[in-house]
């Protein structure tokens, strides 16, 4: 046990050294809440709330062993992406998660360094890195590891940095000492539910993608967006932060991220709607090459911008 305590301490220190803002550990198979979250996902899928995101149906999510055979521990990390600044132009809105460089690559590179450190301490250890593209219950395991709780808007909330937090996980065959799982403390607050213009949060923790502005601007591949979405878009052309903007845990002073690669791109802060309408595909591809927003194809950007101009 002494060895596992020492290794746990070293792994956590290494994770903080790499710049993560929240670090916690969960033991596999986890508490009964993991079963609860897995069952909740199944009900969400059965209701069709994933819309066209068929990858959400992957059965691999149901069993952590599908990700790494013999997994015993999970290191969960959170990386603050909040920047205390606003876009100059108010005629378009872009979700904060896409302001800097692609967070998937940033988190993966940092976790690789933690994994290599683990290898030096335990040469026989096997490991796997999971970011939010993996068939893995990332929010549930973040909650299990104690770095935050799942809010009613379905984002993970940390008491220090709110919900402006990217998640990453390092699965390992090594036994590490677990932290206490986080307990949801949203209480009776339903500000996120009340603020959503399309009522996409149909009940606490249940987001219907068919009604969600983020889904439609990021994932909907139709040539035109539904009229009921267009009428409620405001100026959102890439994602949506409304439910996070109103969350009380995001109202207190949150420090700006110190991660250089998460500082806002110049075009994100300064371009106007008219600027973006003049961009050809080559300009879009150049601007998006290091961004998580490259998931939105140039034609989708134009569709989204046209849509906010059509709203009644």
UniProtKB/Swiss-Prot annotation:
Family the entry assigns: Belongs to the QueG family.
Name of the encoding gene: queG
Domain (4Fe-4S ferredoxin-type): residue spans on this chain: 174-206, 226-257
InterPro entries membership: 4Fe4S_Fe-S-bd, 4Fe4S_Fe_S_CS, QueG, QueG_DUF1730
Annotated metabolic or biological route of this protein: tRNA modification; tRNA-queuosine biosynthesis
Record key words, sorted: 4Fe-4S, Cytoplasm, Iron, Iron-sulfur, Metal-binding, Oxidoreductase, Queuosine biosynthesis, Repeat, tRNA processing
UniProt protein name: Epoxyqueuosine reductase
Organismal lineage: Bacteria, Bacillati, Cyanobacteriota, Cyanophyceae, Synechococcales
Gene source species: Prochlorococcus marinus (strain NATL2A)
Assembly and interaction partners: Monomer.
Binding sites annotated in the UniProt record for [4Fe-4S] cluster 2: 196, 212, 240, 243
Recorded superkingdom: Bacteria
């Amino acid at each position: 046990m002494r060895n596992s305590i020492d290794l746990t301490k070293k792994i956590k220190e290494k994770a903080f050294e790499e710049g993560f803002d929240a670090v916690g550990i969960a033991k596999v198979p986890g508490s009964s809440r993991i079963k609860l979250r897995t069952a909740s996902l199944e009900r969400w899928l059965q209701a069709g709330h994933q819309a066209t995101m068929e990858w959400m149906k992957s059965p691999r999510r149901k069993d952590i062993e599908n990700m790494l055979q013999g997994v015993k521990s999970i290191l969960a990390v959170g990386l603050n992406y909040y920047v205390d600044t606003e876009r100059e132009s108010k005629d378009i809105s872009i979700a904060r998660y896409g302001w800097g460089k692609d967070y998937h690559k940033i988190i993966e590179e940092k976790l690789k360094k933690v994994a290599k450190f683990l290898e030096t301490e335990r040469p026989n250890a096997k490991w796997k890195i999971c970011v939010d593209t993996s068939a893995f219950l990332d929010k549930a395991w973040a909650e299990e590891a104690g770095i935050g709780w799942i809010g009613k808007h379905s984002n993970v909330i940390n008491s220090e940095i709110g919900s402006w937090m990217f998640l990453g996980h390092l699965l390992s065959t090594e036994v590490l000492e677990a932290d206490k799982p986080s307990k949801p403390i949203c209480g009776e607050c339903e500000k996120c539910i009340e603020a959503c213009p399309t009522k996409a949060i149909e009940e606490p923790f249940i987001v219907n993608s068919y009604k969600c502005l983020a889904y439609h601007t990021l994932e909907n591949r139709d040539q035109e967006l539904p009229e009921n979405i267009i009428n409620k878009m405001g100026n959102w052309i890439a994602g949506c932060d409304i439910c996070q903007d109103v969350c009380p845990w995001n109202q207190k002073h949150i420090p700006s991220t110190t991660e250089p690669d998460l500082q806002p791109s110049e075009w994100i802060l300064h371009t106007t709607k008219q600027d973006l309408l003049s961009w050809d595909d080559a300009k879009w591809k150049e601007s998006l090459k290091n961004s998580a927003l490259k998931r939105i194809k140039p034609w989708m950007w134009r569709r989204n911008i046209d849509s906010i101009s059509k709203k009644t």
